[in-house]
């Protein structure tokens, strides 16, 4: 695995207000020592959840969600992992939520290869004009005002040279389903 960087992307956990904890099946998959970086789209909402993430990886980046108690989290962040510049926002700033044109504008403002946003509690990953966009969804499947059927999800990015292999983990019923999406920097 030389040259690989594993990045865990997750957010909208809403612990303990909407959910007690991460699904047990996700916790089993998230083993300390395997992941180098964590990018979190916010709404953790407490220090306990942050401390748990710190046990999984030394390098944890969090942006502030609209329900986060810690006001010291920045609104936005740009992180470089390998050859990739990655922008991180919670997503409540994107009007309308999840809007492609608004996301593309932010991507250009941040000048990033990958833009990660959350807030909608709905997983998405797609390429648009040679840039890559990820919304990891809600890792706990926390409810959302606009969405009834929330599927718990998180994303692992395997970054190697100019390629990112994105693995999406979704808890559908009792089974963890994994989907693989590849993005090459042009």
From Swiss-Prot:
GO terms for biological process: endocytic recycling; intracellular protein transport; retrograde transport, endosome to Golgi. It is found in: Cytoplasm; Membrane; Endosome membrane. It is a peripheral membrane protein. Component of the commander complex that is essential for endosomal recycling of transmembrane cargos; the commander complex is composed of the CCC subcomplex and the retriever subcomplex. Component of the retriever complex, which is a heterotrimeric complex related to retromer cargo-selective complex (CSC) and essential for retromer-independent retrieval and recycling of numerous cargos such as integrin alpha-5/beta-1 (ITGA5:ITGB1). Component of the retromer cargo-selective complex (CSC). Transmembrane segments: none annotated. One of its GO terms (molecular function) is metal ion binding. It comes from the Eukaryota. Keywords: Cytoplasm, Endosome, Membrane, Metal-binding, Protein transport, Transport, Zinc. This is Vacuolar protein sorting-associated protein 29. InterPro entries: Calcineurin-like_PHP_lpxH, Metallo-depent_PP-like, Phosphodiesterase_MJ0936/Vps29, Vps29. The keyword Protease does not apply. Belongs to the VPS29 family. The gene is VPS29. It holds the Pfam family Metallophos_2. The keyword Iron does not apply. NCBIfam families: yfcE. Its main location: cytoplasm. One of its GO terms (cellular component) is endosome membrane. Component of the commander complex consisting of the CCC subcomplex and the retriever subcomplex. Component of the heterotrimeric retriever complex formed by VPS26C, VPS29 and VPS35L; within the complex interacts with VPS35L. Component of the heterotrimeric retromer cargo-selective complex (CSC), also described as vacuolar protein sorting subcomplex (VPS), formed by VPS26 (VPS26A or VPS26B), VPS29 and VPS35. The CSC has a highly elongated structure with VPS26 and VPS29 binding independently at opposite distal ends of VPS35 as central platform.
């Amino acid at each position: 695995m030389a040259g690989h960087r594993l990045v865990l992307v997750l957010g909208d956990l809403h612990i303990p207000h909407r959910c007690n904890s991460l699904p047990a099946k996700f916790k089993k998959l998230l083993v300390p020592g395997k992941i180098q970086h964590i990018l979190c789209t916010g709404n953790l909402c407490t220090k306990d959840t942050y401390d748990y993430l710190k046990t999984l990886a030394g390098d944890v980046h969090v942006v502030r969600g609209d329900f986060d108690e810690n006001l010291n989290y920045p609104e936005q962040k740009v992180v470089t992992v390998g050859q990739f510049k990655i922008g991180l926002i919670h997503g409540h700033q994107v009007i309308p939520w999840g809007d492609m044109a608004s996301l593309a504008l932010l991507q250009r403002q941040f000048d990033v290869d990958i833009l990660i946003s959350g807030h909608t509690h709905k997983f998405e990953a797609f390429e648009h004009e040679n840039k890559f966009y990820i919304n990891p969804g809600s890792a706990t499947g926390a409810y959302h005002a606009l969405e009834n059927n929330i599927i718990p999800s998180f994303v692992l990015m395997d970054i190697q040279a100019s390629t990112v292999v994105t693995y999406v983990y979704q808890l559908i019923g009792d089974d963890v389903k994994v989907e693989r999406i590849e993005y090459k920097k042009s």
